[in-house]
């Protein structure tokens, strides 16, 4: 993430022979690797030769710059004018709308507020009044008296980010404003550090929300079983190694975050997000694990059927059936790999997408085709690579990773699973599911 990592941290990653999934994501976010995980030597050389205690910044055009920390421990932000006088952060001062506004302007939200509101108005016109939605006055809204309304001003006063987004859209809607409990604040004093931290927390939380929706399929729930947060969310966005999902829920909303219409995140262009976050969202879109399996599998030995030594109608028929099955499996793998850089095609397979294929066991059948395309040696080599690279998500899925039998030998149950049979799945059907002809 721009402005978060020290050169020394990245240099340590670059010195490793094998990087973890989280470390690879960091290198991609900084432009040191391509989305296909290929190194960018010129930028790596820049980092290798930079001062170890410098902070790495990524400009909008992707170029790198390095800022050495000042003696006070603060770093100069790109574009900050020397000698510019600002309200000092970390002190208390008598409340005034003007000073609050000054602090807010220095810490604005990283996402375009107008675009958020436009998308919400277009795609979420009617929040359903069911047991699964917001109750009256469930969303707590705080705002400073006399301060112009914006999502950033709501954040500064302690409103949570998802609540601020909803309020910005539905505050004037008689159909929806029943869900808000609005409190106008006019304190005697303002803690400038707390105000700024509120906005920064909102910024981090909205970035995490995008990652969770795109990468895990939705937002966490306060009432559901605790689910793990990715290393990217914990360490790259929040810089909190032990951050839990229930803690993130508190940062996101005063209500249950799972009630928020998460599909709206798929409608907001990722170009409005910081590069490192948009890159992370595009890296691992929920609903596309078969594509990630295919990208890995293509590196290993493919299966081939030897021509039978004894030719007769029975052996010839069996040979042709097996050959056609393997050839179709290979073509399916090729199609999946060809879509690996097609972001829009992958979004169609997201669990929240209305365009997602309704075919039963579709992902399971794709996985079976991927495993079928490999020789037994190829499957074992892929299994070994999954272990060496510590791809935990793949290890948890025995359909791609396999399992050990009673003799300790790797087997792949997906190949004998009737639900995984892809004989009725055509290559054209796979293309159509991803919006391709």
UniProtKB/Swiss-Prot annotation:
Keywords: Capsid protein, Helical capsid protein, Host cytoplasm, Ribonucleoprotein, RNA-binding, Viral nucleoprotein, Virion. The keyword DNA-binding does not apply. GO terms for molecular function: RNA binding. Pfam families: Nucleocap_ssRNA. It comes from the Viruses. GO terms for cellular component: helical viral capsid; host cell cytoplasm; ribonucleoprotein complex; viral nucleocapsid. It is found in: Virion; Host cytoplasm. Belongs to the ophiovirus nucleocapsid family. Homomultimerizes to form the nucleocapsid. Binds to viral genomic RNA. Encapsidates the genome, protecting it from nucleases. The encapsidated genomic RNA is termed the nucleocapsid (NC) and serves as template for viral transcription and replication. This is Nucleoprotein. It comes from Mirafiori lettuce virus (isolate Lettuce/Netherlands/LS301-O) (MiLV).
């Amino acid at each position: 993430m721009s402005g978060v990592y020290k050169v020394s941290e990245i240099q340590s990653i670059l010195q490793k022979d094998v990087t973890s999934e989280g470390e690879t994501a960091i290198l991609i976010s900084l432009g040191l690797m391509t989305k296909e995980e290929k190194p960018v030597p010129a930028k790596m050389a820049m980092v290798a030769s930079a001062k170890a205690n410098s902070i790495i910044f990524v400009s909008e055009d992707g170029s790198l710059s390095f800022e050495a920390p000042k003696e006070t421990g603060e770093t100069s932000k790109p574009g900050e004018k020397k000698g510019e006088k600002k309200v000092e952060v970390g002190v208390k001062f008598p409340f005034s709308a003007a000073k609050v506004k000054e602090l807010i302007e220095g810490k604005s939200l990283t996402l375009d507020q107008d675009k958020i509101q436009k998308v919400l108005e277009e795609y979420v016109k009617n929040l359903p009044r069911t047991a699964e939605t917001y109750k009256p006055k469930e969303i707590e809204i705080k705002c400073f008296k006399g301060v112009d309304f914006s999502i950033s001003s709501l954040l500064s006063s302690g409103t949570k980010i998802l609540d601020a987004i909803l309020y910005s859209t539905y505050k004037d809607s008689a159909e929806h404003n029943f869900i808000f409990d609005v409190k106008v604040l006019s304190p005697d004093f303002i803690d400038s550090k707390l105000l700024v931290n509120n906005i920064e927390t909102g910024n981090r939380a909205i970035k995490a929300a995008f990652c969770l929706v795109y990468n895990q399929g939705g937002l966490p729930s306060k009432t559901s079983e605790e689910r793990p947060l990715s290393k990217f969310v914990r360490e790259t966005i929040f810089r909190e190694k032990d951050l839990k999902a229930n803690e993130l829920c508190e940062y996101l909303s005063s209500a249950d975050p799972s009630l928020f219409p998460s599909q709206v995140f798929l409608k907001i262009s990722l170009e409005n997000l910081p590069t490192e976050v948009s890159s992370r969202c595009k890296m691992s879109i929920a609903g596309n694990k078969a594509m990630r399996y295919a990208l890995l599998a293509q590196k290993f030995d493919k299966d081939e059927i030897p021509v039978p030594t004894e030719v007769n109608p029975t052996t010839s028929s069996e040979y042709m059936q097996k050959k056609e099955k393997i050839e179709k499996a290979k073509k399916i793998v090729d199609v999946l790999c060809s879509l690996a850089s097609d972001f829009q095609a992958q979004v169609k397979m997201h669990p929240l997408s209305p365009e997602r294929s309704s075919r039963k066991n579709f992902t399971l059948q794709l996985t079976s085709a991927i495993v079928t395309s490999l020789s037994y040696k190829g499957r074992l080599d892929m299994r070994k690579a999954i272990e060496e690279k510590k791809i935990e998500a793949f290890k948890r899925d025995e359909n791609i990773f396999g399992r050990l039998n009673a003799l300790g030998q790797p087997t792949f149950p997906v190949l004998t699973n009737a639900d995984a049979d892809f004989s009725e799945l055509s290559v054209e059907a796979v293309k159509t599911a991803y919006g391709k002809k």
